[in-house]
């Protein structure tokens, strides 16, 4: 999974201002990291259905945050999609 240092590094990279941990950009970046990690895990553990369900829930949560961001500020949304290399 990820430790405190990785999480802090992701937050620093995507925060909109100092001390920002709850903006959609930060939340989507953290979810994307976890989704990528779980995707790799499921490649070698094909029958881990509990983790697969968690992955689908995270993807849904990320989708909702991205929809919110695209409705609120389309430029921030496009910038985030480009920075994270998410296809949409």
Curated annotation (Swiss-Prot):
Part of the 30S ribosomal subunit. Forms a bridge to the 50S subunit in the 70S ribosome, contacting the 23S rRNA. PROSITE patterns: RIBOSOMAL_S15. GO terms for cellular component: cytosolic small ribosomal subunit. This is Small ribosomal subunit protein uS15. GO terms for biological process: translation. The lineage of its organism: Bacteria, Bacillati, Bacillota, Tissierellia, Tissierellales. It comes from Finegoldia magna (strain ATCC 29328 / DSM 20472 / WAL 2508) (Peptostreptococcus magnus). GO terms for molecular function: rRNA binding; structural constituent of ribosome. SUPFAM superfamilies: S15/NS1 RNA-binding domain (SSF47060).
């Amino acid at each position: 999974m990820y430790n405190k240092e990785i999480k802090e590094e992701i937050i620093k990279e995507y925060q909109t201002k100092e001390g920002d941990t709850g903006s959609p950009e930060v939340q989507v970046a953290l979810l994307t990291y976890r989704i990528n990690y779980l995707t790799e895990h499921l490649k070698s553990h094909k029958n881990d259905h509990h983790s697969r369900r968690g992955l689908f829930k995270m993807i849904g949560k990320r989708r909702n945050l991205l929809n919110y961001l695209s409705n609120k500020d389309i430029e921030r949304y496009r910038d985030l999609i480009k920075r994270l290399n998410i296809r949409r």
